């Protein structure tokens, strides 16, 4: 019994696991550059994705300093199945199935930023919305399907399934309002989400989030309306 208790305490000291938590008006805070602080999210996926939409808020001072990972979705087959990344020189980088597409940033923000990205296999069309404003549509990985059995991580870029983190690509700041759908939201629906709605996310829901924190990650009240 003593050995079992010790094993349990060791596991809980390494990470904190929470299931189905309502994260409304809260945010994950990554206070410093590391290669071991991140949040892993558990998604509800039963079949490969032929489309998706991911929306979230970020707040950071790193825009003019260096690149960093915003959202990293990896499978054992492909480390960058879905990637949302910021590059100081190229702007937002969206990736599907290991192929990346840059989107020029409309401006360098000094306040919290709301980001939505969507993609569909049938056309390959990939979209980026920044603070409710659509950027020029582009095409990427037409006919591709995003794999299941995924590791979804906030705060670090996965160069292998669930690992190979680089502190120079880590996120420093706040991430919140993370929602994901297995279909492409319409412009009207994107606007609803930007205005504070959720529109029933069915892959990841910020109002019922199953997550695990690792390293120095804190949960605090959000700093945006």
Swiss-Prot record:
The encoding gene = CRP
The protein's required cofactor(s) are namely: Ca(2+)
CDD domains in alphabetical order? PTX
What does the UniProt entry say about where the protein is found?
Secreted
Residues in Pentraxin (PTX) domain copies: 24-225
GO CC annotation, single:
extracellular space
Q: What is this protein called?
A: C-reactive protein
Per UniProt, which keywords does this protein have? Acute phase, Calcium, Disulfide bond, Metal-binding, Secreted, Signal
Q: Which PANTHER family has this protein been placed in?
A: C-REACTIVE PROTEIN, C-REACTIVE PROTEIN-RELATED
Predominant place of localization: secreted
From which organism does this entry originate?
Answer: Cavia porcellus
One Pfam annotation reads Pentaxin
Assembly with partners or alone: Homopentamer. Pentraxin (or pentaxin) have a discoid arrangement of 5 non-covalently bound subunits. Interacts with FCN1; may regulate monocyte activation by FCN1.
Name which cysteines form disulfide bonds.
55-116
Q: Name one GO biological process term.
A: regulation of interleukin-8 production
- Which sites bind Ca(2+) 1? 80, 158-159
SUPFAM superfamilies documented for this protein: Concanavalin A-like lectins/glucanases (SSF49899)
Task: List the PROSITE patterns.
Answer: PTX_1, PTX_2
Q: Which residues bind Ca(2+) 2?
A: 159, 169
Entry superkingdom: Eukaryota
Which family would the database say this protein is a member of?
Belongs to the pentraxin family.
- Supply one GO molecular-function term: low-density lipoprotein particle binding
Annotated signal sequence is: 1-19
Write out the tissue specificity statement of the associated record.
Answer: Found in plasma.
